[in-house]
Amino acid sequence: MPYLHRSLRPQPQPVPRDARTVHSSGHSFEQLRQSCLQSGTLFEDADFPASNSSLFYSERPQVPFVWKRPGEIVENPEFILGGATRTDICQGELGDCWLLAAIASLTLNQKALARVVPQDQGFGSGYAGIFHFQFWQHSEWLDVVIDDRLPTFRDRLVFLHSADHNEFWSALLEKAYAKLNGSYEALKGGSAIEAMEDFTGGVAENFQIREAPEDFYEILEKALRRGSLLGCSIDTLNASESEARTPLGLIKGHAYTVTGLDQVNFHGQRIKLIRVRNPWGQVEWNGPWSDSSPEWRSMSLEEQKRLGHTALDDGEFWMAFEDFKTHFDKVEICNLTPDALEDNTLHKWEVTIHQGSWVRGSTAGGCRNFLDTFWTNPQIKLSLTERDEGQEGCTFLAALMQKDRRRLKRFGANMLTIGYAIYQCPDKDGHLNRDFFRYHASLARSKTFINLREVSGRFQLPPGDYILIPSTFEPHQEADFCLRIFSEKKAVTQDLDENIDIDLPELPKPTPQEEETEEERQFRALFRRIAGEDMEVSAEELEYVLNAVLQKKTALKFKRLSLLSCRNIISLMDTSGNGKMEFEEFRVFWDKLRYWMDLFLQFDVDKSGTMSSYELRTALKAAGFQLGSHLLQLIVLRYADENLQLDFDDYLNCLVRLENASRVFQCLSVKNKDFIHLNINEFINLTMNI
């Protein structure tokens, strides 16, 4: 039987108890409500105040808005009136049609709706001016608490509102979502699939209608039957076309909701229909099968009633599926499970989640087009061990989401262009270097790199080990990300970030004076001339000695070593604790310095006297310091310049402090354990000396 959504009055659902409350007080919704009831006050949310800061970040309201509680707007406010339905969603003076389309779709799935809109609240008994809504964010559910003060102008809600003026669940839901993202202005412009995922924790799937499979109608039918949320839109060629109205009443660049599918007999033919809703609550399709079109006159009243046909200008309309494919460009589906819509069976999916970051200078390597930095991206090992039932391969879905970009819009952040590539894993552990990607092609990749919040793809590969590389398209772009891997059989994933491993050589014994080289004899003469008979130099004197020697190294381009570097060198080599360096200590350090210079010259590929911060991981590893990404990020922040380059002085300073810290730890660790115990005095003493 064809599937058609119908409005059902929701049954009260228990409030989910695994959502984390988001409020600066640390108290739950119920604790805050009870506190207000006991004190006889109405809740005021200091985290999202009734002020312009909650409205806009780049402008001021053109007219003065007045924040009012529902009881100050109407005499008998209701939270939900006659069930939460798609007709409760009418767009206001905010360009968030994408959000409204998602909310309209949410009302078609009563179970999902009851999770997002808990029904333990209202304006009757227990009212305290406080409400809460739940949203999925990057692998967890958040319980967002708000007060019920809403922006109005002349006693009318300015933004989202219900067609029934005394119903407020949709307006309060919009406010909670605005709080989650920092302001109402942050909700301007977007994709319906973004909010759909936040309402369900589901998986996005996008279809370009002109490239859709032949059974596209059946795919949509199955999606609705499974409770998926569906949106659709018409592309624009330029900004001037945004929200332009076509002759047939459709709006370009505007988010619509798919609310139903059905088939009817019409003049001896079976016609496939699709029902679509405009969140404006008005402006509809005026072609065949529109509200007042002649096609309906040949349908019985019973059939019209079954299809829910009305001639009201409520924004919802039917159209022939063939017309839909002609006039719309894109369909977005948020599946509540990763099951393929082409598949008739449901599976139990295993899921693993990775939270990571692209950090400029260390892990923001860009796509494979940028070979010199691509290898520095986060690398995730995926082990597929079991074939799917009756299949030769292992099916999995990879969904890469960039985090918090909407909330960061006020700081100039936009959606980055993201994607991923999948490689066969070699028979070795550890972070793969540039040469691997130079000589190996990817086995699979995301369909495209695109500036959407999430990019997802479905793959089937033979059992084995693979490396998944999530990245932005361009290098040096920063963002946090969440990668979800869904697999039919249990898959093992591992972040290939390297563990800290320090390999320090034994300090060499002093060379007898009679065995010194000519260079060492020259050092001794220079050292004696600067230090005097005690043969000890201060940091200032060491600065003079090293710069005098290094300036003769024509292959090494640098201005000079800083006094800070020389102080750190003495801290590393000073065994007597007098703040000076003896000649034998200098000789030991000189051997070390020559090796470090050779490494620097090796990684100064353009002979500019600087090293790229992206090469630092390999350079430090060659020097005996295998470090994880987080520590590398801290080092880059401290030592790299604004162009992500390190000169020799920065490079040397970094190595000296790393070795000093490592040797101090070795001395203090008991039986070579991976931890030490320090009191506050010992800790400060150590940090001041490293």
Swiss-Prot record:
Arranged from A to Z, the UniProt key words for this protein are: Calcium, Hydrolase, Metal-binding, Protease, Repeat, Thiol protease
Positions of region (Domain III) = 338-521
GO BP terms in the entry: proteolysis
* EC class: hydrolase
By its UniProt entry, which SUPFAM superfamilies does this protein fall under? Calpain large subunit, middle domain (domain III) (SSF49758), Cysteine proteinases (SSF54001), EF-hand (SSF47473)
Q: What does this protein do?
A: Calcium-regulated non-lysosomal thiol-protease.
Question: What's this protein's name?
Answer: Calpain-9
Question: What's the name of its gene?
Answer: Capn9
